Amino acid sequence: MSSSSSQSSLYQPRPVLSSQRFSPAPDYIDTRRSFHGDSRLPLRESTGNVQQQHHHQEPSSAHSSFNGGSLVGCYQTPVTLSPSMQSSIPPPAPIVPSQSFDCLRSLQATTSRQHHHVPPPLPQVPTRYHQRGKPRNSINPLYFWPAFRQYRNRQAHKDTQKDKGGVWRRPELEDAFVDSVLLMPHMGRRKFSMGGKLHGRNMLISEYIFVICVALLGSKEIFRIDNSNDSIEQMGRKQVSSHMQVVKKFFEDLRCFHFLFPSEEKKEPGTTNSDDFYEEEEQESFKSNPVLTALAEGRVPDVRPNYEYFSQLLALQSSITVRPKTVEIFVSSADVKIRDEVAYDANDNPLDPASFPHLGKYMNSSGDDKPNVLGKDVLLHEYTRSLDRSTSACVKTVTRRWQRDAPAMYDSLDLPDRDEDCLLLEMCSTVDLHEHAKFPSGSELTGYVEVSVTQPALQGHRWKCVTRLTRPPELQTDEGRPEMYSNESGIHRRGCADTRHEDCGCHLRPRQDIHVPFPAVEWASILSMAVQYPDVEHQRKKEKRSCGKKPDLERSASSSKRKRSEDEGDAAAWTRREPTGSDLICKVAMYQELWSCAPDSTRWTRQAIIFWRFSTTNQWYKYNPVFRPAGTTWRWLTVNDPMSRYHQQRALVYPSAGGNNMPRDAVMSPTPSVSQHLTATMSENFSQAWDSSGSNVTTHTQVHVAGGGGGGGSNMTTLFDSFPSGLATPPPTASLHGSYSASGSFDAGNGVGGCYMPPTCGGGADGPHGGLPAPSQSYFDAAGQTVNTTFGDVKPLLSGSATNPYLPGAAGGGGTGSLDLSGQFAYDDGQQHQHQHQHQQHQQQNHNGGSNGGLPGWDMGPALDSWTAGSSAGGAPAATPTGPDWGPTAPVPRMTEHHPGMWDPVHWSNHGTPGRGGEGSPRQMKRRRTEVLVDGVPVTAGW
């Protein structure tokens, strides 16, 4: 294998010799799970063609293998541009590469064969999700959803035919589209600025497909439509938007729908704006997203979707225990009689048809045609009846509102740790309030809620329901009642004679449907109290509608600008208005827990939590009264949040040439640009200021640090790989070519005039400088003992007792000093010459005869250019240089005045971890901010 040329693109991998790549010992390979069909095993290193392998064994055979060698042709970029993460961060779940990059791998292989004059192989069939011999776990899991699979089977023969209605005309673009659904982060109301334009999620998906298309075909002409004045980009975006609407319909029933497609922002019932916002600390920054960063740079992202993680989200469908079937809330009476098309109450008083419009259903029917859904009861008013389904959402949309309006309900809520433990669903009921809620005597409020049991194993269980409800103070009928209503009751069959006891025979026969007890008594008082707070604005608009007055469209159009200017005044007036019954109904919070118990067991298991959200038909939109139809809409809820950092950091797989470790760009904010990578690489490999060979620091990898790295340019490790916890800011002299000695090894004492690495464990206050180390003391020595570490292993400490988890402890049990670079003092040549004699005395006082095991500091003083190394590799440190060891210093004018505040103890009041002398670093470390991976809520226990 020959070395590659220096002009390598971002899409063409850089060949790496076998001696330059770490090849771990081959693990056990289960060919029954790792390879299918007639696929051959990858070549070993002994053959000269190294293919790195990482086979991960799990108890389940669904996701069992991971071939890291297949990533090299697609994801591997030059080593100096793709730093890998250290083992301090747990690697992601093993997964195989995305199928959307198979076309790129074949394209790269063709380019490589042309470069090396290798004859092309036989043409291959385009990689599709139904390709034989391809492992199931290497395919996007969305292809296996039954509804979408049927759609793709119907469209498969049209994809490659231009005039037959194909969506993309290339099958690889469909793979890229399906992958982009998993790759693109959820943005909410935010936009990503790229190329001077704000991009939403659909626009970013279009850009992703464009990048794949250019890498595959060389241009975007495939999106051009004849006889269209739109640009290619506009055509592609319209095509993506239309295809997105078609694909979304196949996944509407998923519990994880909101992880794939952003849920529609719905207004909070009864208010003008939605409270479903996300705080900034809950979201992952766009600057640290590798997908968006790659699109902004016009290249194919190095990351791919985590198929195993999304497969686990899709597997939530198998844990559905119940499904809503019927929700009806109505008022009926058995004492109302209908004679001669007139309804009479128990006292033979006629009822007003205008107050009870539902009586009209009985007036126009006779004999056996009369409604009999309620038996002998007559329907007087219907609050809600229709049932519809909406797409899934996060449970935070409910709990965040409760945290503000119903803190007692929020405190009593016990959410599950995982979505597999308990089913969460929401019932959003829009009720039609009665005009005066004065019903005849003998009327009853009925809440009929029925759910179907989807798990056959649960149909023979005993069931019970725990209901909790809170209401605002305005709807309280009795001041002495508790703030929260709580009730626990068993769920029995209709007509069960022993409903007060749990030992009835309801569970002896399997039940496919169960009736959820509804707190009708509580809601009867709530609905009766709500009508006492009239809604004047909606009533006025309803009267105008009944009079047949239509709004003047021309007048409204001419006053639109004035209306927009008055929005702020309308908002202020809207907030000062009196609360209405609709506003109070929206503040009612209720949830019900469904528990089941096996017939031969006494252990109750929580199967589902039903969250109730109530609103009325009188709602607001942009401070204007609007009307909504009555009905109930339900949807699935999840504990996991697609907007959280937990999800966005696990939705992607970060391939690397050295293993399954996550790259540093995933946890750095902002992500270093390409120019920053190149600058660091050139400073590392070509700058003389970074080249030295006299360091005695024991490290796992050879690190190029100013004056302390290993010599030569043979080391391919980048500057960023030297620091496992993030970037470290180089000193200002990193780009300067200093006339250093050949050895390049300087101890801590050499940097008196311009040292940018102050000591962390000084020799106490006995020296004139109050904290400078002895010439033989390392910057990372603790309690006089040498600690072998690297510059990147040291981080600033927040307090004297705080300990960074990424900071290795001292070998001798002493304190660990902190490195601080923020409060740098300015030293000029005069000050250096003035304190040179004091520094020599300080070196003699603090000399302890230890070995020089720390990293040297940076020196910017021109008078120290001819210094030699203060210590050798294996011997004891040399004494303070005298006589011929000192080179001639340049004559500099002495400062007549010395600033007394430079050595004021106030500047050294910030202590780090106690070192020798009880004092730590006085200055904070100046470095790039690194976001720490914070696990959020786990989804499965296997992570």
UniProtKB/Swiss-Prot annotation:
Disordered as annotated region, ranges: 1-69, 111-133, 537-575, 809-901
Chief location of this protein within or outside the cell: nucleus
Protein name: Conidiophore development regulator abaA
Alphabetically ordered keywords of this record: Activator, Conidiation, Nucleus, Sporulation, Transcription, Transcription regulation
InterPro entries, alphabetized: TEA/ATTS_dom, TEA/ATTS_sf, TEC1_TEAD_TF
Record keyword Transcription present: yes
GN (gene name): AbaA
Superkingdom, taxonomy of origin: Eukaryota
Family listed: Belongs to the TEC1 family.
Compositionally biased spans, kind Polar residues: 59-68
Biased composition (Basic and acidic residues): 29-43, 537-555
GO molecular function, one term: RNA polymerase II cis-regulatory region sequence-specific DNA binding
Induction / repression: Expression is positively regulated by stuA through direct binding of stuA to the abaA promoter region.
GO biological process, one term: conidium formation
GO CC annotations, alphabetized: nucleus; transcription regulator complex
Function: BrlA, abaA and wetA are pivotal regulators of conidiophore development and conidium maturation. They act individually and together to regulate their own expression and that of numerous other sporulation-specific genes. Binds to the sequence 5'-CATTCY-3', where Y is a pyrimidine, making both major- and minor-groove contacts.
Compartments reported by the entry: Nucleus
Bias type Low complexity, positions: 865-889
Keyword Transcription regulation: yes
Species name: Hapsidospora chrysogena (Acremonium chrysogenum)
Pfam families with a match to the protein in the record: TEA (PF01285)
Residue ranges: DNA binding: 161-254
